[in-house]
């Protein structure tokens, strides 16, 4: 039990950037995605009553296709949307095409797409 208490104390002392990096490292180590886990957990709550609506796509992935000419503005928007640090956001933008946000609703995906396109990026919804 003392090990668990120490672990809780250590995790509580992490900064937001360190916590985001830890989450990314755990996702890579375990081969999972935190966004997918949230989507799976939210899925059963809808129940079987939504079966007719299942034909229409309800979850979207916002994919940064290209940064365009205003790369700095796009990096700022990616940071605002994802909460990533400067280096991580820069790597994501320079590594396009890459997903920015996964498992988002149609409305949220449209808003994020508009935000990124306003900054100068080319964006796809999948």
Swiss-Prot record:
Entry superkingdom: Bacteria
Transmembrane annotation, as ranges: none
Entry's Gene Ontology BP terms: translation
Keywords: Ribonucleoprotein, Ribosomal protein
SUPFAM superfamilies linked to this entry: ClpS-like, Ribosomal protein L7/12, oligomerisation (N-terminal) domain
Pfam families, alphabetized: Ribosomal_L12, Ribosomal_L12_N
GO molecular function annotation: mRNA binding; structural constituent of ribosome
GO cellular component annotations of the record: cytosolic large ribosomal subunit
Task of the protein: Forms part of the ribosomal stalk which helps the ribosome interact with GTP-bound translation factors. Is thus essential for accurate translation.
Subunit structure: Homodimer. Part of the ribosomal stalk of the 50S ribosomal subunit. Forms a multimeric L10(L12)X complex, where L10 forms an elongated spine to which 2 to 4 L12 dimers bind in a sequential fashion. Binds GTP-bound translation factors.
HAMAP family with a match to the protein in the record: Ribosomal_bL12
Family membership noted in the UniProt record: Belongs to the bacterial ribosomal protein bL12 family.
Family matches, as PANTHER family: 39S RIBOSOMAL PROTEIN L12, LARGE RIBOSOMAL SUBUNIT PROTEIN BL12M
Name of the protein in its database record: Large ribosomal subunit protein bL12
Annotated organism of origin: Methylobacterium sp. (strain 4-46)
Gene (name only): rplL
